[in-house]
Amino acid sequence: MCSSDLAAVIHDPVTTTDELIPSGETSSYRSNPLRLAEFTLSRRVPEYVGHAKDIAAQEAERREGKLPEYLKAVLSAVGDAAALAGTTQFGSAVFANKPGDGSAREQAASCQKVLGGFANICYSYATKRYRSNCINWGILPFTIDEGTPFDYADGDCVFVPDVRRAVEEAREDIPAKVIRKDGSVEDLMLHIRGLTQDEREIILDGCLMNYYAARIAD
């Protein structure tokens, strides 16, 4: 299972790769992924990096066997928090209507992953290359149906039960729950359509590098 906290919600018609990770002043940091990631969405959602880092820190605590109060509250909204804590990973997510327009900039996806990004949610991807980059970095490329309202906000959380099994079984329709900041819970149907077998295995392995490492080891 995974739970993705919405660290950025962008309702512009299109979100470009230059908005996801600006060019120019960032070019000197291309060999420093941690420093480069500090610029993610800096021109569009300045709060994104801090929010994503906070979620990543809480996930690190969960991995150590702790259960931060925020994560406990999220899990309590959908079930037994103590039972779910051991099987639910937490990460950040970005919603944008149509992300990835512009140059084929790998860092537009890799910087999200460096900050603990688990998922993107959109109506469609502007380019196949950006979607592929997300997959190669282990970011779940969710879509929702055109016309489905997405009136959620930064800080709301998307809980996706059995997502690993859904990817393994090539399911394209994946029911999820959205836990709003006020504690209310709503259903949301997510989709991951058109994944190849290799793409599914890349996501399951965590990223393209892990995918190749596993096959070299075999």
Indicate where each model-derived feature is located.
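Fe-S-dependent hydro-lyases/dehydratases of central metabolism
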Residues: M1-D218
